[in-house]
Design a protein with these regions (language model features):
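Boundary at the C-terminal end of the N-terminal hydrophobic targeting segment
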Residues: 22-24
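Extracytoplasmic electron-transfer domains, predominantly the class I c-type cytochrome c fold
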Residues: 55-102
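Gly/Gly-Pro-rich "capping" loops immediately C-terminal to redox-active cysteine motifs
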Residues: 27, 31, 35, 43-72
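Short, cysteine/histidine-rich loop/knuckle motifs that typically chelate Zn2+
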Residues: 40
Length: 102
């Protein structure tokens, strides 16, 4: 029993580190997706280049549903719908990049 108790914190730490590395990898891959689909309007560092596009650094970090709807359906007159152009995996990678702060 004492060995199990000692092993649990080590296991938890290992899982946390593995999860953090996976998120970092996703953010890196998300940057590639961002550069392919988003950088023209939203700018290199998620800040527009003087246009009317939304500053993505200010996007709520806890609202994936809103992010997904905005990307897939478009937003207003400036943001085109990307449904059918970005995959579900690309969308998740973009979200990881957004979460990382660029």
């Amino acid at each position: 029993m004492p060995r199990r108790r000692a092993a649990l914190p080590a296991l938890a730490l290992g899982l946390t580190l593995a999860s953090s590395l996976a998120l970092a990898d996703d953010a890196e891959l998300g940057r590639d997706v961002y550069e392919e689909f988003c950088v023209t309007c939203h700018g290199k560092d998620m800040v527009n280049s003087g246009g009317v596009t939304f500053d993505l650094r200010k996007f709520p970090k806890d609202d994936f549903a809103r992010f997904q709807a905005s990307v897939l359906n478009g937003k207003g007159q400036g943001m085109p719908p990307w449904r059918g152009k970005v995959s579900d995996d690309d969308l998740k990678l973009l979200w990881a990049y957004l979460q990382s702060g660029g």
